[in-house]
Amino acid sequence: AMNLNLPDKDKEIYSLLGSGSVGNSIRLLKYDGATIYRSILSFLNQLPNLNGFELEKFVSTFVGSKNREQLELLIELLNIAIARISKSGVLEENFLDQALNEENDIFQKLCPNPNIAKRWAELAQVQAKNLSHGLAVNLDPGSLILDTFFRIEDCAKTIR
C-alpha cells in the first residue's frame, strides 16, 4: 500500500480535482497535479492582464513527447478551472463550501454573478472542444494552451 504523507492543503486539492476517483487521484499525484493547478490559479489571479513571458515559460515545460501525460493533465486541469469559475458564479456563496482557499478570491473576482457565469460556461465548452480537437489533429500543444489562456484573458477583460 502507498503511504502518502500529504499536507492537508494537498489532500483537499487531490480529492477535489480527482473527482473522488482513486485512479485520477494517483495520476494527479504522479504528475504533481496540485502544483500544476496552483500554477493555473496564479495565472488566473493575474487577470485581466496575463504575464505573457511567465506564461510561455510555464507552458514550454509541458511540450515535448516525453511530457505527454503532464500535458494532458494540464489541459484537463485548465478545463476544470474554467468550468469551476463558471460554477462559482452560479452557486455564489454556496460554492465556498466546495472551493479551495486559493480559488475563492480569484473566482469571485472573475465571476461575480450568474450572468457572467454564462460567459465562462460557454468559454469552458468551446475551449474544451478546441483543445481536444487541436490535439487530435496534432496542432502545436504549446500554442493551443497559450491560445486558451489568451481566450480566458479576453473573457476576463469583458468583466468590469
Regions found by a protein language model. Name each.
Residues A1-L77, I82-R84, S88-R160:
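Charged, glycine-rich active-site and insertion segments that engage polyanionic ligands
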